[in-house]
C-alpha cells in the first residue's frame, strides 16, 4: 500500500494514499468535527464544519473530501477555524427550530453537541420561520423539516444503501429543503419504512413515531394483561443508550427493566424465531421436493417485504408465507398462551420491542390477526424502550440480571443470531441439514453466511442434494441480487434478505450513534458479535431442539406446516408496485 507523509497540527502523519484529511487526522488521535459526513455513504463537504487550513491553499478545505498529498501541512483547530465553525453553527441555528428542552433528541443531538463544544450559547442572526409542516402520514416515522440542517445524510442513505430514493433535495438557495417528489407526504411514496434515515439523522428532523404513551396506557389499565417481547438484537444494543460499551449483551438487565416497568409477562421473541425456523424450514423442504417458486426468500424483515412489494412485485410469490417472529409471537400469545393461561385475547395487550421502525408498519398490515385482533398491539423501538426506562427512574446499569418468564422464555442460539445478517439463514440451515440428513451436525456454525459483506453466497450438500443459498442486507444490495436472479445470471434455492445493512443490529430503531462513532467504528460487527457469543456459549443451539417449540407443536399446532399452523403463523402479501397502495 502506497503512503504519503504530511503534518497535521505539526504532528508527522503517515497516511494511506487516497485517504482524506479527516481519516489521516484520526490516525493520530485528532478529531475533526463533522455534521454531514458518513463514511462510504455521504461525502459531500456540505456542512462546512470540518473545514481545515492547508498551507499554501487559497481557501479552507473540507477535511471529509480533501485527499492528503505528500508534504501537505494541515491545521485543524486554529482561532480562525474556531470562529468560522462557531459562525457556521450560528447560521445553521438561524433556520433551525430550537425547542431543545422539549426535543426528542435533546442531549442526543449532534448539532446540540457541537454548539456546546464551540460555545454557541446565543445567536446573532435573526430566525426566520420557513413555514415547514410536519409529515406524520406514516405509522413509523415523523418528518419535521423545521429541524433539518440539510446535511443530506437521509437522502444518501435512502438512495445509496436502500435503493428507494423517496426523499431528495428540492428547490435551490434559501428555499432548499429535503422532501419527497412534488412535496408529497411519505404515505404517497414507495417508502419502505426501514427507518435508516432516522438512524443517521443528526437532529430530530427524522424520528420514529413515539408509541410509548400507548404502552403506558396499557400498563396502567387494570383490565389488561400486558405482555412484552424483545427482539433478538435488542439485548445487544440497549446498553448503548445508558453509556455501556457497544456490543454489550444486557439480556438479564433488559428483562429486569421490563419487569420494573410493570409488564405482566416478559417473554422472549427469540422463542418465536425458533418457531419461524420450523415453519420456514418446512416450507423450504416442501418447495424443494414438491415444487414451488424458487428461490424461497425469507420474510422476517418487514422493510424488505414492503420493498419487494413496491420495487420487485414479480418476486412476491417467492416470499416465504411465514409471518415474522414478531407477528408469530403475538399470534401465539393470543391463541396458544391465552388458552393455557385462561385469558380472553381481547384483554391481552402484546407489546414488542424491536430494532426496527418497519415493525410499526407491519403490525397494521392485513393478514396479521390470527384471532380477529391485531397479533401485536404496539411495537416500540430500542430507543423508545430506553426512554421509558429513564422516565420510570430505573437505573439500568445497576439492575440485577433476571430471566425471562416460562412458556416463551426459552430460546435456542439459532434464535438469538436472527439479529445479524446471515443469522436467519444459518439458523435454518442448522435445522434443515439435520432433518434432511438425519445426522447431528458436528459443528452448527455456517461461517460462509456470516459477516457484514453486502452479498454472500454458499453451496451445501444436503444428503446428495446441492442447495445454493445467498444472503444479502441493505436494499441496494438486495436489488443487485434480485436483478441477477431475474436475468438468470444467478440461481439459488434459498435467499435471506434483511432491509438494513448488517441486519437488525443496524436497524432503524437502534440507539443513535454520532458520525464520529459511525465513521470510525465497525458498529455492525461489534453488535453482531454479542449475539454470536451468546449463541456459542449455549448448549441449546438449534431451533428444532427447543423444548418449548416441541411442546408447542405436540400440544397445539400438531406439526410444522399443519393447517392450524398456516392459519396462525402464515400470511399473504400485496403486489403494490411503485405507485400502488402504500
PLM features per residue range, with description:
Residues 162, 201, 337-341:
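Structural motif corresponding to the C-terminal cap of alpha-helices
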Residues 48-193, 199, 206-221, 225:
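Fe-S ferredoxin-like electron-transfer domains
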Residues 1-11:
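Eukaryote-biased recognition of intrinsically disordered, low-complexity regulatory segments
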Residues 14, 137, 147, 190, ...:
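Charged, low-complexity surface patches
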Residues 4-5, 15-81, 85, 209-582:
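Iron-sulfur-associated redox domains of electron-transfer enzymes in respiratory
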Residues 9-11, 181-183, 233:
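Short strand-loop junctions, especially beta-strand C-caps/beta-turns
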